[in-house]
Amino acid sequence: MADNRKYYYLKLKESYFDEDAIVLLESMQDGMLYSNILLKLYLKSLKNGGKLQLDENIPYTAQMIATITRQQVGTVERALQIFMKLGLVEPLQNGALYMSNIELLIGQSSTEGERKRRERRALQEQ
């Protein structure tokens, strides 16, 4: 039986790091840390359509985010406040955070889809 897993990936435009919000973020003290945290949060939210949740009922807290991003809680709390001010993250009514514009960054594929793409490429190269 074939192993057909679904994969999610983050698609960044070539100009991602030139966007105003990212330039402003990285120009701040600890901005490179914040940028790193932001990318990790985008990746963490992919499977949930942009929501930062451990599961359907448990939204990530600042402490949990600090643990998964390997950063200090204070750094994560400051980063989240800045992300909200810049419109990169929005709080939801259930306490979860939503990564704004995530729909522009999400891609998905499956192992079966990848296998078919490889076959098509091989046929085109013949």
Name what the model sees in each region.
Residues M1-N94, N101-I106:
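Positively charged, structured surface patches that bind polyanionic biopolymers
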Residues Y42, Y98, A122-Q124:
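Amphipathic, positively biased hydrophobic alpha-helical segments used for protein targeting
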